[in-house]
């Protein structure tokens, strides 16, 4: 008996959101998407009962814009468990260790979805338990423990239960959006978190609490409320790198422009309908063919490595210096320092006095980050294309099923597959590597609102793709015959 037969009784009974039986009207899809978005913002503002927020430490602070969620809320873990489970499944599927045919076998599809949910539950435990009980990153409030009479261990149990419920909720919220809404829940949550930071970075006012945003700062500079240094060197540093944030604004606008341009670069393969004369179309193979979602997997892998390092530092007294050295919870040396991604200008601009790190160490760290992101982006893009039905074989079958064919070629899926193999694998690798390079460069230069460059890159690309999906949904809504022809529902 194989593992599928042994695991089927458990995996097939995993709770799941029911698929719609027929076509879901566009307005209803928008309603589901908007409702889940409101619920997400609500849950990020529900604080953990029993948490001593004053001494709590956000393990995913540097990666929060990518992993979504909110520190100290029931969505403490964000999409981390979902993404980590996806990494494991991508690696197992890429090595063909699962033996699942998710394209053609309904039974394997059910097993795959059940296995994903099981892995998400495991990742919630593997991430949440050390965070609460071992590393003391989410300490219990002593006053709550005394008033309830259950001790700090009991309060920590309550904290873990809350973040576990939050992890399960975000899993099913993602599934609802994927089946009943527009786009994916993971992408929606990233857009929500990054947009919130971006708007705050542009429009926040010091009088409302916190630091001044970009516009408030420049109003102060223009009116003279904020004094600028007299020295030309200090003036340029303040305007571009300091309060003025001009470099951050330029980087933000540059990322918007590059991503929108890259999304529009494509190779278009002509198609014609086999039975309807004059019906023609094109199959676009975009430069960023695999989308930017594989980049979430790469950054999440880095986040898990750093999470493990901080956990070891807090619980392993004799942790060797070659593995990692920490100062005030931040890695400053050892292997984990070199593996830590560049997050902002303060991590590498030694020539401006923004960091005291050795220039050679900084150069090695930047080089490792570039290699990790470029190679990782390409590898995960390949895995993503193959496991999401975007590879040459799956695409050829979809074109065949829609009644389309490539002019000048026989109407045969094998023939279409050979044509697709000329473009899809190469474009997938180039696009994945390009996104990795852009992510590192964006992080190095910084962005408005202290949003990570990777987070902004993901947000712009996901928003662009969401716009395309909404336009496609509206077209299908106006012309139901096209929906039947291309099998959208």
UniProtKB/Swiss-Prot annotation:
Query: Does the record bear Transmembrane helix in its keywords?
Result: yes
Q: What is the similarity comment for this entry?
A: Belongs to the SecY/SEC61-alpha family.
Report intramembrane spans.
60-67, 68-79, 80-88
Gene Ontology cellular component annotations, sorted alphabetically: plasma membrane
**Where are the membrane-spanning stretches?**
21-47, 60-88, 111-135, 154-178, 185-203, 245-266, 292-313, 365-384, 428-446, 451-465
What's the protein here called?
A: Protein translocase subunit SecY
Topology: which residues are Cytoplasmic? 1-20, 89-110, 179-184, 267-291, 385-427, 466-488
How is it placed in the membrane, per its record?
Multi-pass membrane protein
Q: Does the keyword Transmembrane apply?
A: yes
* Function as written in the Swiss-Prot or TrEMBL entry: The central subunit of the protein translocation channel SecYEG. Consists of two halves formed by TMs 1-5 and 6-10. These two domains form a lateral gate at the front which open onto the bilayer between TMs 2 and 7, and are clamped together by SecE at the back. The channel is closed by both a pore ring composed of hydrophobic SecY resides and a short helix (helix 2A) on the extracellular side of the membrane which forms a plug. The plug probably moves laterally to allow the channel to open. The ring and the pore may move independently.
Gene3D superfamilies on file: SecY subunit domain
Keyword list, A-Z: Cell membrane, Membrane, Protein transport, Translocation, Transmembrane, Transmembrane helix, Transport
**Pfam families per record:** Plug_translocon (PF10559), SecY (PF00344)
- What species is this protein from? Haloferax volcanii (strain ATCC 29605 / DSM 3757 / JCM 8879 / NBRC 14742 / NCIMB 2012 / VKM B-1768 / DS2)
Could you tell me the gene encoding this protein?
A: secY
Write out the topological domains of type Extracellular: 48-59, 136-153, 204-244, 314-364, 447-450
Q: What is its main location?
A: membrane
Task: Give the multimer and partner information.
Answer: Component of the Sec protein translocase complex. Heterotrimer consisting of alpha (SecY), beta (SecG) and gamma (SecE) subunits. The heterotrimers can form oligomers, although 1 heterotrimer is thought to be able to translocate proteins. Interacts with the ribosome. May interact with SecDF, and other proteins may be involved.
Return the InterPro entries for the record: SecY, SecY/SEC61-alpha, SecY_CS, SecY_dom_sf, Translocon_Sec61/SecY_plug_dom
Gene Ontology biological process: intracellular protein transmembrane transport; protein targeting
Q: Where in the cell is it found?
A: Cell membrane
